[in-house]
């Protein structure tokens, strides 16, 4: 898995902060917890020790994952671009022709996607269909429930 990963600036900074917290706070704390649990004697029936070792495994795994992800990541900077088409990182307002409702999505990476926050993955059916389209374009998207048709009514690079 050596492919590069596009991230928004917000997501990149969030991953960096999580990595710093794990290395500077969580790792030393779990090492201290292991030492304290070890001081209680018999490790074969020491639930505190087992829990701390499990937590240490999780923390070390997450540190590895974040280091790998950040090493392959690049930040998509939209600040110098004219918002004339849908690209990774753009915020798009759509008009759903069937429901006659407006929907706003931000096109993000897979790790950032959260439909409740209006963030959809660039690899999702809707995300893939929207990328490259311009203002006032009509876009048909095949979704599990059938085909949806949207009109792009606004594009922002935030």
UniProtKB/Swiss-Prot annotation:
Record GO terms (molecular function): DNA binding; RNA polymerase binding
Q: Which superkingdom?
A: Bacteria
Its GO biological process annotations read: DNA-templated transcription elongation; regulation of DNA-templated transcription elongation
> What would be one Pfam family of this protein?
GreA_GreB
Transcription as a keyword of this entry, yes or no, is yes
**InterPro entries assigned to the protein according to its UniProt record, in alphabetical order:** GreA/GreB_C_sf, TF_GreA/GreB_CS, Tscrpt_elong_fac_GreA, Tscrpt_elong_fac_GreA/B, Tscrpt_elong_fac_GreA/B_C, Tscrpt_elong_fac_GreA/B_fam, Tscrpt_elong_fac_GreA/B_N, Tscrpt_elong_fac_GreA/B_N_sf
Keywords (A to Z) from UniProt: DNA-binding, Transcription, Transcription regulation
This chain's function reads: Necessary for efficient RNA polymerase transcription elongation past template-encoded arresting sites. The arresting sites in DNA have the property of trapping a certain fraction of elongating RNA polymerases that pass through, resulting in locked ternary complexes. Cleavage of the nascent transcript by cleavage factors such as GreA or GreB allows the resumption of elongation from the new 3'terminus. GreA releases sequences of 2 to 3 nucleotides.
By sequence similarity, the record places it as follows: Belongs to the GreA/GreB family.
Query: PANTHER family attached here?
Result: TRANSCRIPTION ELONGATION FACTOR GREA
- What is the name attached to this protein's record? Transcription elongation factor GreA
């Amino acid at each position: 898995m050596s492919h590069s990963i596009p991230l928004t600036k917000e997501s990149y900074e969030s991953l960096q902060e999580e990595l710093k917290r794990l290395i500077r706070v969580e790792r030393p704390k779990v090492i201290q917890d292991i030492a304290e649990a070890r001081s209680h004697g018999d490790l074969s029936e020491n639930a505190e020790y087992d829990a701390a070792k499990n937590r240490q495994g999780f923390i070390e795994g997450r540190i590895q994952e974040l280091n790998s992800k950040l090493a392959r990541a690049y930040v998509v900077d939209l600040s110098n671009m004219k918002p004339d088409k849908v690209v990774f990182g753009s915020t798009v307002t759509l008009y759903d022709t069937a429901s006659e409702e407006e929907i706003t999505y931000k096109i993000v990476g897979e790790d950032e996607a959260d439909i409740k926050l209006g963030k959809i993955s660039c690899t999702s059916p809707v995300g893939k269909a929207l990328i490259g389209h311009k203002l006032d374009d009509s876009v048909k998207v095949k979704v599990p429930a059938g085909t949806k048709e949207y009109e792009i009514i606004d594009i922002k690079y935030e």
